[in-house]
């Protein structure tokens, strides 16, 4: 079967080189016209060879082919979004009219997805709900998760049983000089990072993954799901903690050291007390 990757929220194309290595066809969906021009310029050869398609549109769950309001961030293009920003920060955005397409319509045009990456600045849950409602289940799926809503939707649906986590802030350092299809590859800053079995660690079952999320929290983190891979049942709490970022590991080590010091102080005090008593 043809491997098709849907990059929903392509930005300036940081993920595309990796996705081209992992698929037969990449569908890059990006609302910002200037960023789409950058993608078209940088990947002209792949577009000409039929390996890459650029959809310059807002991806929505609404009726197809309608111009809609979109909010371009004036300083940081990665923060541009479809939903209206909070009034307190609205002046940081430029409101423009851009073409839109329904996510299901896009998939019907290009074919069954092998992997879908969703990174749409506060619109992620809308797209995820629509995919699950329409029974669109790619073998691999990732969604940026700033709250518990994403994992709740996935678990309530019940289709995906295997999970991994990618911390966006760690991607450039953690996934540097990796062998991808016999090519030495490093993921750039702002890249979504790897998917599938290119992510470090074993796949987790639900209860272990929820424990991991309780340790590391939400934010700039992508939840990855798989229909292809069975989860490991033998993750222990310390393994899960070491799966996560170094700050958490250091925090846990400090706590362990603290309690060890308390323990040895107590033992020494008790021993001295016994000596003075007898």
Describe each PLM feature range.
Residues 33, 76, 101, 121-122:
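Alpha-helix N-cap/helix-start capping motif
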Residues 3-4, 18, 22-25, 104-254, ...:
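Conserved acidic-Pro-Pro-aromatic motif
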Residues 60-101, 105, 110, 183-186, ...:
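Glycine-rich adenosyl-binding loop in Rossmann-like folds that engage adenosine-containing cofactors
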Residues 57, 101, 118:
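Cofactor-binding loops of NAD(P)H-dependent oxidoreductases
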Residues 1-65, 145-147:
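SAM cofactor-binding core of SAM-dependent methyltransferases
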Residues 46-53, 93-94, 112, 137:
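A short helix-to-beta-strand connector/capping loop
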